[in-house]
Structures are given as structure tokens and as C-alpha cells.
């Protein structure tokens, strides 16, 4: 392998799905200031909005994840209109 090709900061990171609270450990180069205790060790924490544990494609369930209130905003503008 060539030296200096791969990033130095490639390390284990905990990813936390904020829609359902599931966490998993993977390697990443992401920069984060937060840490969390996971399986007896302290790791950097990255909060994500959706993952394979909550995405409708992987779960087979049709759920609506609205983290920014966009659905409510849309429904208040266009949801009550009649043809």
C-alpha cells in the first residue's frame, strides 16, 4: 500500500439514529466533538436523522419522518384545498 494515501483520522464512531434511538458502531473519518459511552468504551458520536433501522425501504413500513415540521407547513398551506 502507498503511504500517506489513507486519512489519519479513520477511527470507530458511534452513529445514533435520532428518529428511533438506535446506535451502531462503524469506522469513519467524520469530525465530531460529542462522545458517548457504547459497549463499555467511549467513542465519538455522530447523530443522524435516518438510518437503515428507520428508513421505510429497509423496514418495510410506510412511516413519515418529519424532523423540520415541513409536512405540517405543507398541509397548512395546501392540505385543505378542494379541487
Curated annotation (Swiss-Prot):
Task: List the cysteine pairs that form cystine.
Answer: none
Ribonucleoprotein recorded as keyword: yes
Provide this UniProt record's keywords sorted from A to Z: Ribonucleoprotein, Ribosomal protein
| An annotated GO BP | translation
| Domain of life of the organism encoding this protein | Bacteria
Sorted alphabetically, the Gene Ontology cellular component annotations on this record are:
ribonucleoprotein complex; ribosome
Q: Name one GO molecular function term.
A: structural constituent of ribosome
Q: Which SUPFAM superfamilies match?
A: L28p-like
Q: Which Pfam families match?
A: Ribosomal_L31
- Indicate whether Isomerase appears among the record's keywords: no
Per its UniProt record, what HAMAP family does this chain match? Ribosomal_bL31_2
User: To which protein family does this belong?
Assistant: Belongs to the bacterial ribosomal protein bL31 family. Type B subfamily.
* Subunit structure of this chain's protein: Part of the 50S ribosomal subunit.
**What is the protein name given in its UniProt record?**
Large ribosomal subunit protein bL31B
Species of provenance = Bacteroides fragilis (strain ATCC 25285 / DSM 2151 / CCUG 4856 / JCM 11019 / LMG 10263 / NCTC 9343 / Onslow / VPI 2553 / EN-2)
Q: What is the lineage of its organism?
A: Bacteria, Pseudomonadati, Bacteroidota, Bacteroidia, Bacteroidales
